Amino acid sequence: MEKWWLNSMLSNEDLGRRCGLSASLGPIGNTSGSEEPITNDNEKNIHSWSGRGSYSYSNVDYLLGLDGVKDIWSLISGDTFWVRDSNGDSYSVYFDIENKIFEIDTDSYFLGELESLFSSYLNLNSGSKDYNRYYDQYVYDTRHSWKNHINSCIDSYIRSETNMDSCISNGSNNSSDNYIYSYICSDSERGSDRGSSNLKTSVSDFGRHSDLDRNLKYGHLWVQCENCYGLNYKKFFSSKMNICEQCGYHLKMSSSDRIELLIDPGTWDPMDENMVSIDPIEFHSEEEPYRDRINSYQIETGLAEAVQTGIGKLNGIPIAIGVMDFKFMGGSMGSVVGEKITRLIEYATDRSLPVIMVCASGGARMQEGSLSLMQMAKISSALYNYQSNKKLFYVSILTSPTTGGVTASFGMLGDIIIAEPNAYIAFAGKRVIEQTLKKTVPEGSQVAEYSFHKGLFDPIVPRNLLKGVPSELFQFHGFFPRP
């Protein structure tokens, strides 16, 4: 276990108000005076704090006799944090993620002694650059790697210890209002030399492995970024449009979330909701029958098929829109998907509506054989009539991943083709190309930015602008808001 000296951006008053914690919540060593003993695995490492005025000074004497700065941390063992809030008050926070223990001590006497002696000890060793360098590296180097770990642990166990779901959210979407955000000391010291530190690597690896190990156990609390492996609090992830708060990576969105993002509230009118596949070629599978697999995805996603189609308003402009869902059999295009998209385009043709297709697919569905390949021609034929004969406007939005038959048909037929940042866009996947051609595919050659520079599509639009850009395009082409 590692120990850290932290400053907290959450005051004692806020902590008590949000989490319903009293000034002394059964802290380490039971300083609250409660008769009920507190037991945890760290008692052997945490020295006696019992009694308001009877602290053992043997610990303080030991602090003064340390041979190295590293041993200072033995005074605060396990997951115990010395915290100073924005008001300058000090307290300790202890949490044990395995045994589900969360304790806070707000007694300022001992912590004041600890802080004073800690500062005195550093002053005594101020002549040694090695000691200061070790301390600087130990305290400052790991702010980024431990930020999410501390936030998620404290946030989770405040809820579990107080049985209050409402203590997390106060009506604000700002994550800094909902987490206990901690940072290592002050901003002015962040520029300290870190190049030769071995601690940075070891602690960063420890934090990353801890996140990975706990991802399954606490998967209901967070979403892990597939790019940087940072943790994003699940409760607020949808409000952040599934964008990683750490690196800005655009993670996959469900079709329902995309409809909520693009369509004005109260204007969504779905089409052909109950159209389902009937296994037209009676596909044989030794593992799971095709119909059973369809049923399992329907239960898992709540959708009838891999695409949702309908009409609605985008910033007041009536549109027809189809949104593919990669969670439903990889967004594969079967006969039902092709039929729903074709009907949507024909409906928009008859009513002179602009069309948006949001693509997220692995390609044609192999369980339907040549019938799935026919959908490419059928949709393309409907689009030809829509674009060439009726002179209407079609916008294609390519998200990650867009591959196979979708890329080879309606995905690349838009009058304007928009891509999301870092979207995986290709006809054949990297593994298929390498196995077929026996050649290595260069890293990054199938992401949106690479294809953009080759002229494959038009703009790359971040998700937070994805509603505004099509709206401006529609108005430029003569489609305006209607009451």
Swiss-Prot record:
Zinc fingers classed as C4-type: ranges: 225-247
A GO MF term: acetyl-CoA carboxylase activity
Gene3D superfamilies: 2-enoyl-CoA Hydratase, Chain A, domain 1 (3.90.226.10)
UniProt enzyme class: transferase
Signal peptide: none
Disulphide bridges: none
Enzymatic reactions: N(6)-carboxybiotinyl-L-lysyl-[protein] + acetyl-CoA = N(6)-biotinyl-L-lysyl-[protein] + malonyl-CoA
Keywords for this protein: ATP-binding, Chloroplast, Fatty acid biosynthesis, Fatty acid metabolism, Lipid biosynthesis, Lipid metabolism, Metal-binding, Nucleotide-binding, Plastid, Transferase, Zinc, Zinc-finger
GO annotation terms (biological process): fatty acid biosynthetic process; malonyl-CoA biosynthetic process
Pathway membership: Lipid metabolism; malonyl-CoA biosynthesis; malonyl-CoA from acetyl-CoA: step 1/1
Domain CoA carboxyltransferase N-terminal residue range list: 221-483
Chain positions recorded as Zn(2+) binding sites: C225, C228, C244, C247
Cofactor, how bound (note): Binds 1 zinc ion per subunit.
Compartments (UniProt record): Plastid, Chloroplast stroma
Subunit structure, as described in the record: Acetyl-CoA carboxylase is a heterohexamer composed of biotin carboxyl carrier protein, biotin carboxylase and 2 subunits each of ACCase subunit alpha and ACCase plastid-coded subunit beta (accD).
Function according to Swiss-Prot or TrEMBL: Component of the acetyl coenzyme A carboxylase (ACC) complex. Biotin carboxylase (BC) catalyzes the carboxylation of biotin on its carrier protein (BCCP) and then the CO(2) group is transferred by the transcarboxylase to acetyl-CoA to form malonyl-CoA.
PANTHER family: ACETYL-COENZYME A CARBOXYLASE CARBOXYL TRANSFERASE SUBUNIT BETA, CHLOROPLASTIC
Cited HAMAP family: AcetylCoA_CT_beta (MF_01395)
Family per similarity comment: Belongs to the AccD/PCCB family.
Protein's name according to its UniProt entry: Acetyl-coenzyme A carboxylase carboxyl transferase subunit beta, chloroplastic
